[in-house]
Regions:
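Mid-bilayer segments of alpha-helical transmembrane spans in multi-pass integral membrane proteins
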Residues: 52, 73-82, 86, 90, ...
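Structural signal for the C-terminal ends of transmembrane alpha-helices
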Residues: 33-37, 87-94, 154-159
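Hydrophobic alpha-helical transmembrane segments
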Residues: 25-29, 40-45, 74-79, 101-106, ...
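Interfacial aromatic-anchored transmembrane helix boundaries in multi-pass membrane proteins
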Residues: 9-19, 47-84
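Alpha-helical transmembrane segments and their lipid-water interface positions
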Residues: 42-46, 53-57, 84, 88, ...
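Non-cytosolic membrane-interface motifs at loop->transmembrane helix junctions
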Residues: 18-24, 64-70, 128-137
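Hydrophobic transmembrane alpha-helices
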Residues: 1-42
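Membrane-embedded alpha-helical hairpins and interfacial helices in multi-pass inner-membrane proteins
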Residues: 94-162
Length: 162
């Protein structure tokens, strides 16, 4: 699971207005496939790998920089991964398309809530936090949520094999 997160952090897909990684997709995927406890533990292991200096995060240098990188502008988003993984595994997604889509928007919001709070603390609340930390990613996030909504029930069925 943490290897999948690492790979998803390193692959950048051209998208408007900024390139997208598949990290948030994989975090939600892990929650749906593994359930809340295992997914949260998997994301926790991924974060620990980054904290000790392994180059697992998006844009982290080959040699990694551990705590220095972790406490940078993306720390809040990374912490939000834990909550997103937990709630993606906890909520019931065996419903209709619109409800699944709404629940996935809810679970991904933890990434942005924590990310924006940390960004505001780090760079100052007088800066355009939403324009820097949320708006550029909105279309890509909605695209990923749409894909996950379409395949959520199939992903959940993976739990029987894990």
């Amino acid at each position: 699971g943490s290897l999948l997160l690492t790979i998803s952090a390193k692959i950048k897909i051209p998208f408007y207005p900024v390139p997208m990684t598949m990290q948030t997709f994989v975090v939600i995927f892990l929650g749906l496939a593994f359930g809340s406890k295992l997914a949260t533990a998997t994301v926790g292991i991924y974060l620990i790998e980054g904290l000790i200096g392994l180059p697992v995060f998006s844009n982290s240098p080959e040699k990694g920089v551990g705590l220095v990188y972790f406490t940078g502008p993306t720390m809040g988003y990374l912490i939000g991964f834990l909550f997103t993984a937990y709630f993606a595994g906890y909520l019931n997604f065996k419903t209709n398309f619109l409800i699944i889509f709404s629940k996935l928007v809810f679970v991904v919001s933890f990434i942005y809530i924590f990310g924006l709070i940390w960004l505001g603390i780090l760079i100052g609340w007088d800066k355009p936090i939403l324009q820097l930390g949320a708006y550029p990613f909105l279309y890509a996030e909605l695209f990923k949520i749409l894909i996950l909504t379409l395949i959520a029930k199939k992903i959940i069925n993976l739990k029987n094999f894990i």
